[in-house]
Amino acid sequence: MARSWLRARSDEAERMDDAAQGEAAFRSALRDLEFLNRISFGYRPTLRWLDRLVARTGVRSLSVLDVGAGGGDMLRRIDHWGRARGVAVALTGLDRSPAAAAAARAAGTPGAWITADLFDLPGDARYDVIVSALFTHHLPDADLVRFLRWMERHARHGWMINDLHRHAMPWIGLWLGTRLMRLDPMVVHDSTISVARAFTRRDWRRLTAEAGTPARIAWQLPFRWAICTEGKA
């Protein structure tokens, strides 16, 4: 039953995507999302990819754009990563929600911030690397294909997507865990929808082929995918 239940991506809306959500509710949800990312090692795939890219290219400075940056927690981890490895990072967060910018500033997120739809950025905008985490499952397939092509054009050295795997086990785990830990109601509501909107390896193969973007598709524990280019010259 579970296999057929999650066979195709859901199009059910997440509350976090609702612009009517107030700033206080949004910030509360972001705090609990950061907690979930921390206990599930959700930052590790992106930071390991940055390690590989720096080792391959030899660069000692990087401009980084985080798309769908939320409260800036990934940018804060990348800032710490850069300091620990002696890599200068110029960080930019991008999120279309004004509440995200306010939450990121309140949390002390370093770098610049852009409140806009990513496709509204200037055509000549370029960054050394573009990353996103738990963002692509918010997009319908057609917009995701467009996003893959967009990153290929706008990233000098490479890009990396870090997102969920659609499967019954994480769905059940999040349904139980978010309730047992009494997390924010928006997180409780959205967590299982996020899994249902997420991707399988077959999805990623189809979508990257449609976009015409060569990419590495790698399984990440627990129940995540890393979709990335491994570094341009």
What positions do the PLM features span?
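N-terminal auxiliary segments of SAM/dcSAM-dependent transferases
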Residues: M1-A19
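Class I SAM-dependent methyltransferase Rossmann-like catalytic core
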Residues: A19, E23-V54
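Class I SAM-dependent methyltransferase SAM/SAH-binding core
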Residues: L65, G71-D120
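A conserved beta-strand element that flanks and buttresses the S-adenosyl-L-methionine
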Residues: V131
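A short, conserved alpha-helix within the catalytic core of class I
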Residues: L139-W150
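Conserved beta-strand signature within the Rossmann-like core of class I S-adenosyl-L-methionine
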Residues: A155-L164
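C-terminal alpha-helical "lid/dimerization" subdomain adjacent to the S-adenosyl-L-methionine
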Residues: L164-T208
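Conserved Class I S-adenosyl-L-methionine
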Residues: R197, R201-A233
